[in-house]
């Protein structure tokens, strides 16, 4: 709305109630605080928010863009956040189920810098059947490190099977290792 004459210049729609709305000094971005605790970062030249920023308990954060890419200081352990797929609307999938394809470290800065992230595939094409994982044993070694033996079993789903394609190890919600090596530090 132009303040000079009250004419509507642009019309935006967002779901949920807003608690506060602030425009940046350069008039290029609206920051919207929502009732559910999100901050929407909405460039005024776009028809949708660029990203949502959420503060989580225990100094956690979550940044999510409109296509599902996310960043967090606890990328695989945010119980209050889940994926709900159109073909299984009553089944909430944990965030880590899509970590390989949608976790993007530094997402906030990358989006603000104008980086355009390419979707790896459509969500409906992703194999969402998790394997069965059991901790078999935990042994403390003489060097103070722990040796953990896990058993991973394939699980058959309606249209796919699970398997173990990427292995990620978390300790207290923090990602501490990857396998295979091309995704990060080898275990």
Which role does the model predict for each range below?
Residues 73-76, 144-148:
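Short, polar loop/linker segments at the starts of domains and inter-domain junctions
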Residues 140-144, 151, 156-187:
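Long, low-complexity serine/threonine/glycine- and acidic-rich segments characteristic of extracellular
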């Amino acid at each position: 709305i132009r303040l000079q004459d009250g004419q509507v210049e642009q019309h935006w729609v967002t779901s949920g109630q807003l608690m506060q709305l602030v425009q940046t000094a350069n008039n290029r971005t609206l920051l919207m605080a929502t009732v559910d605790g999100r901050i929407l970062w909405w460039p005024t030249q776009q028809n949708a928010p660029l990203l949502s920023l959420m503060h989580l308990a225990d100094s956690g954060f979550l940044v999510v863009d409109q296509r599902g890419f996310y960043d967090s200081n606890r990328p695989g352990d945010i119980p209050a956040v889940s994926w709900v797929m159109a073909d299984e609307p009553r089944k909430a999938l944990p965030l880590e189920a899509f970590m390989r394809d949608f976790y993007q470290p530094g997402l906030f800065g990358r989006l603000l810098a104008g980086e355009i992230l390419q979707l790896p595939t459509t969500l409906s094409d992703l194999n969402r059947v998790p394997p069965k994982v059991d901790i078999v044993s935990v042994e403390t070694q003489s060097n103070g490190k722990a040796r953990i033996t896990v058993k991973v079993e394939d699980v058959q789903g309606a249209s796919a099977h699970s398997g173990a394609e990427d292995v990620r190890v978390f300790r207290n919600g923090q990602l501490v290792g990857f396998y295979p090596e091309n995704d990060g530090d080898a275990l």
